[in-house]
């Protein structure tokens, strides 16, 4: 190992919560040190570790997430910026499966202003087809960006090489490759395995404890694969089972039930972390709701997980045979409480009696087709043009607002860029109008549709 440098080079991993900072820290450190979870703000303190990158000893810092609304956010942000100032290199991690927010861009610019020796690391780019997702981050304006997937170990070697070059630690060191290093290398076999995985629809079953998730899994697979009990929280680890419908493979993941945060202790915290990991790899969520009693606030919070992970979603109303109210009342309440999921199909069932199970299976395939849909550019622009003609864009301070053209740059979920002269003038209500128009024309059943306004000049520059 090279120890010729008396002062170790320091690398800080920064970014908003839930983007994979701690997972990257663990990957680079080659052991599980930081607690990783998909709940925003898991890392509160700065984790410091001496590690070896290709034989070079460096100091790695994993920082708390910099979310604006996080508890202790001001203190965490100040600590982050101090770490950035003291570091030789910053790895600013973003979630490649999401559209960058104004807050994302603002935080990155603050960090970059503090220390320009900064790499933009776009995580969760799990395969070649998802590379187009990284285009959404072109507005960050940095030439030093890297597409990686920590969970699939993609792009990590290239990132390490770039880090060593930036720190002037790029001399070749002769050393024996141990088993861990060999195991971490990206190989064509890994790529082939990922291609096979893409052919399987990944479905996460989510809901509160004891709403019937395990019973639903058993009914879907016709197996007693998941332990069913009246004791809340029977399922601890996610349990998966693959079935075949025609030529289509569907992998179901029965996740641990989620209860109020204040009651999460010990092994349930572990179970909740595993649930979040399972959802990150899912395409579609089956949100199971118990209609033997009125909906509760936690049902709404859990439903936001599908939105958070940009998943397709199907609402499953379980225990319909013992529902607490008439059909009309339940549907009216559902529409009111889950208004943001108005595009999701609703299926009533009794999992123990296996009612409407085939309908659920076929609806999964239908939603997945919508989730994977790509609209021809000519058709997309025709609909956008007609919509803007029918209801013109409001002016911005007396100045005309134009949409030059639209392009779909990603699927799973569908993501569309509107190339405009004044993108910041696109009001959320008008964006909602365009999304509703696209849903009506192209059928995005159960599928989130992401619309992203971009400046024409920035697109031309990139």
From Swiss-Prot:
Source organism superkingdom: Bacteria
Positions with a binding annotation for GTP 2: 207-214, 254-258, 318-321
SUPFAM superfamilies reported for this sequence: P-loop containing nucleoside triphosphate hydrolases
Entries under PROSITE patterns matching the protein: G_ENGA
Gene3D superfamilies per record: 3.30.300.20, P-loop containing nucleotide triphosphate hydrolases
Residue ranges occupied by any EngA-type G domain in the UniProt entry: 9-171, 201-372
Pfam families reported for this sequence: KH_dom-like, MMR_HSR1
GO terms assigned for molecular function: GTP binding; ribosome binding
PANTHER family (UniProt xref): GTPASE DER
Subunit structure: Associates with the 50S ribosomal subunit.
UniProt-listed HAMAP family: GTPase_Der
NCBIfam families: GTPase_EngA, small_GTP
Protein role: GTPase that plays an essential role in the late steps of ribosome biogenesis.
Protein name from the UniProt record: GTPase Der
